[in-house]
Amino acid sequence: MGKPQALKDRLFGAAVLKMSFRLRGDEQSPAFKGIYPGVLRDLELEDEAVEKYIQENRAAVEAAARGKPPV
């Protein structure tokens, strides 16, 4: 088993995944609906916490979702 991730790292990963779908307008897609709940479960996160993280760190999350270096 790998090293446990810090909460901020788990939030960042889930936020980037969600933002990548959001930027394409695919949050209602079967792919997102199939993947995202499992990611939340595996990372022991709630969607509300991910949304809060996105609001507080939007620039960095969007940059990562677009495959660009962190802001």
Report the location of each language-model feature.
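Glycine- and charge-rich intrinsically disordered segments
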Residues: 48-71
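Positively charged, low-complexity intrinsically disordered regions
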Residues: 23-25, 42, 59, 67
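Short, low-complexity, polar/charged sequence segments that are solvent-exposed and flexible
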Residues: 7-10, 38-41, 53
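Extended serine/threonine-enriched, polar tracts that run as long, contiguous segments within proteins
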Residues: 1-32
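Domain-exit/linker segments immediately C-terminal to small folded modules
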Residues: 25-46
